[in-house]
């Protein structure tokens, strides 16, 4: 039992969520609320990052489950939180040092079906990215018109000294307001008309995304050097993250495919043949021969009918089938046929009744029955401590 569920609620998962479920939840939410896509959702993005930072760490998660957010803030497992952007970069690839040398990576989520991952597919993805302005060649203005900002001397930062007491000063660093942190200044009349002095422009890019057989939900496809461009930096990457939709029949478990199959009692006892449509539009027939009893909950498999193995597409996992046996309704047989059926089935064990035994009857289980009894019991106890007046009839 966890003390509080706030972090789990932020990610939209249950307290018993696996690491894979946590990763999938973070991936979807982080891409949705990233400041580049939702500039007004900075606080939400921060909450998502903090929740994932704690729950993805086994020690921090254990501490949180026992003591809640207060236990984390008190520093029992390292204390404090990392930068939301650092967590995002570590998850999707990249990092601070990389960002200093290269332009920003662009991350896009691509929705795919289980059929796409089974058969392979090609998708065209249209997106917007920053490219260096070709009109001014990334200068922001005419040749010779760009000058070093005299206010910050080209650093893009201002340092102010603030005296906070006798003999005590505080050094405060802030973005230079004169050049907006660029370290350069361009006269408005000399600014490039195409990019308005920003050195970059937005451009539409069409990417052809090849989804190989056997790729997995959450797998990344990286287009190196196709990300945002910035003057003086190497272009970043475009990272495509595959997001698999749920399938109506099959569930993927690693290289295996899992499904449930309903069969009737006669099929469970006497054998059956069941067709299954595969993800590559073939039909395979599952056969159980007479005399091979299939019990409710039995799990069997078909070799080499699961998912193709990534980069080894001619090898496949297993198709795993869990059987659900449907029993007939009450009274489906007349008494004489029921006697005949009993003779055909294995003999049942008779119970020798004694005087010490009590006869009881089976009834259908009602999960709400105990709840109602508990509620009524509390009501009776309440009446004992707080007697209520009887209902009076109105008299004329």
Curated annotation (Swiss-Prot):
Co-chaperone for HSPA8/Hsc70. Plays a role in protein transport into mitochondria via its role as co-chaperone. Functions as co-chaperone for HSPA1B and negatively regulates the translocation of BAX from the cytosol to mitochondria in response to cellular stress, thereby protecting cells against apoptosis. Stimulates ATP hydrolysis, but not the folding of unfolded proteins mediated by HSPA1A (in vitro). Promotes apoptosis in response to cellular stress mediated by exposure to anisomycin or UV. The modification Phosphoserine is found at residues 83, 334. Residues 6-68 form the J domain. Zn(2+) 2 binds at residues 149, 152, 176, 179. A lipid is attached at residue 393 (S-farnesyl cysteine). A zinc finger (CR-type) spans 120-204. The modification Cysteine methyl ester is found at residue 393. The gene is DNAJA1. CDD domains: DnaJ, DnaJ_C, DnaJ_zf. It is found in: Membrane; Cytoplasm; Microsome; Mitochondrion. One of its GO terms (cellular component) is endoplasmic reticulum. Identified in a complex with HSPA1B and BAX. Interacts with RNF207. Residues 352-364 have a biased composition (Acidic residues). GO terms for molecular function: ATP binding; ATPase activator activity; Hsp70 protein binding; protein-folding chaperone binding; unfolded protein binding; zinc ion binding. This is DnaJ homolog subfamily A member 1. The lineage of its organism: Eukaryota, Metazoa, Chordata, Craniata, Vertebrata.
